[in-house]
Amino acid sequence: MQENLLEKQFLNHPLYTKIQELKALNLTCNFSLDDSVNLSTNSQAKDEILAITKELKPWRKGPFKIDDLFIDTEWQSFIKFNILKPFMNEISQKCVADIGCNNGYYMFKMLEFNPAKLIGFDPSIKYRLQFELINALAKTPIKYELLGVEDLPSYSLKFDVIFCLGVIYHRSDPVKMLKDLKAGLNKNGVVFLDTMYIEDEREIALVPNKTYSKIPNIYFVPSISALKNWCERAGFKEFEVLATKKTDENEQRKTEWIDSFSLENFLDPKDKNLTIEGYEAPKRVYIRIKI
């Protein structure tokens, strides 16, 4: 029911109509990948493309380059992607899902590794519209569902590999979320997940009061030991830490494409090791878990 409502709102959105008009031009596009997702069209529709991209702000994940238009997104998402890149051979010829896929940046980057099928899940009309704009030019076979992680158990496909990046701390029941991920896997499936974490040897989690780094919907920020316990309780048998990284102002910063504050405004101005609320500053752990 929720999917149908979102899909209806999406299809009736005025920007969807504009993107469809752009798609109808059937522009020739050269699609390439480096740190950016690059689209070269040499088209006469540059003004229309610029207008749509401006209406679709904020752009969080990226960057993207469309001809001479550079969408300098809040996050330099290639930094996260490059942490996971050594493991991307695992998606070759596999059925892959990206949960919380935002505008699809990571999925576009994954195409280089030849997945058999690539499906993104995110119940956000704005991010879906951003994806549709990019894909109207790139013309990739990526599929985007206006669904959340809770829809995985009943989804029509199971997946060999699931990416779930920057989602679990937004969930009020992280073990339930992990169970939903597990239910979406094929036999011998694998999940790549990242989360903010706290430095502590104990099996505990930070429960922020109201906000964490000025973000209101952060429920739990676990220690790595607590995260491991969550995964075991959800039924995962293998837990491997791939990397840890502190979030810095090179990776996340304010640009003209977000019209709001960013990391520099979320940290204690006197001590960048603390958030504005006095918690540990954000850092992330990347894990691989298997059933």
Swiss-Prot record:
Q: Where are the transmembrane segments?
A: none
Q: Name one Pfam family in it.
A: Methyltransf_9
Alphabetically ordered keywords of this record:
Transferase, tRNA processing
InterPro entries for this protein = CmoB, Mo5U34_MeTrfas-like, SAM-dependent_MTases_sf
Out of the domains of life, which is the source? Bacteria
BP term (GO), one: tRNA wobble uridine modification
What are the protein's GO molecular function terms?
transferase activity, transferring alkyl or aryl (other than methyl) groups
Annotated carboxy-S-adenosyl-L-methionine binding lies at: 61, 75, 80, 100, 122-124, 149-150, 169, 284
- Its EC number is 2.5.1.-
Q: Which reaction does it catalyse?
A: carboxy-S-adenosyl-L-methionine + 5-hydroxyuridine(34) in tRNA = 5-carboxymethoxyuridine(34) in tRNA + S-adenosyl-L-homocysteine + H(+)
Which PANTHER family does the annotation name? TRANS-ACONITATE 2-METHYLTRANSFERASE (PTHR43861:SF1), TRANS-ACONITATE 2-METHYLTRANSFERASE-RELATED (PTHR43861)
- Record's subunit section: Homotetramer.
Which HAMAP family does the annotation name? tRNA_carboxymethyltr_CmoB
What is the annotated role of this protein in its UniProt record? Catalyzes carboxymethyl transfer from carboxy-S-adenosyl-L-methionine (Cx-SAM) to 5-hydroxyuridine (ho5U) to form 5-carboxymethoxyuridine (cmo5U) at position 34 in tRNAs.
Family recorded in the similarity comment: Belongs to the class I-like SAM-binding methyltransferase superfamily. CmoB family.
Protein's name according to its UniProt entry: tRNA U34 carboxymethyltransferase
What gene makes this protein? cmoB
